[in-house]
Amino acid sequence: MVFLTTRLWLRNRLTDRYWRVQEVLKHAQHFRGRKNRCYRLAVRAVTRAFVKCTKARRLKKRNLRTLWINRITAASQEHGLKYPAFIVNLIKCQVELNRKVLVDLAIYEPKTFKSLAALAKRRQQEGFAAALGDGKEPEGIFSRVVQYH
């Protein structure tokens, strides 16, 4: 059996404590000050870094979603639509693109995004026309205004 380094040769002879310390110091290698040399300080710093790393993974998702919404808002306002109306009308048109894809389209393929905005705007206009109707009351419905003769 050939050992290429003294560390590997020592591993068979020393206790596990040495390797636990080395594992912590390996994670603390890039820290400044005594935190990368003193085990006691390194344990605290590494634990704190791991906790922050875990919390940051959730924050990253939240921040990216906010960024995507801001970018879609800006892109849809260029075409005369507000963000909620744009998203709702795309859903009504059964366009199932998520926010990340919509942002990529807005940045890298503006003509495609323009056609999606036109589709959403057309759907919005159809909704307004259906809500207004033709202005006549249907037969058999009493209105609130009662006319006396």
From Swiss-Prot:
Subunit structure of this chain's protein: Component of the mitochondrial ribosome large subunit (39S) which comprises a 16S rRNA and about 50 distinct proteins. Interacts with OXA1L.
GO CC annotation terms, alphabetical: mitochondrial inner membrane; mitochondrial large ribosomal subunit; mitochondrial ribosome; mitochondrion
Single GO BP term: mitochondrial translation
Molecular function GO terms recorded: rRNA binding; structural constituent of ribosome
Residue stretches spanning the membrane: none
Family named by the database record: Belongs to the bacterial ribosomal protein bL20 family.
Classification via SUPFAM superfamilies: Ribosomal protein L20
UniProt keywords, alphabetically: Mitochondrion, Ribonucleoprotein, Ribosomal protein, Transit peptide
NCBIfam families: rplT_bact
The protein's name: Large ribosomal subunit protein bL20m
Subcellular location: Mitochondrion
Primary gene name: Mrpl20
Chain segment of the transit peptide: 1-9
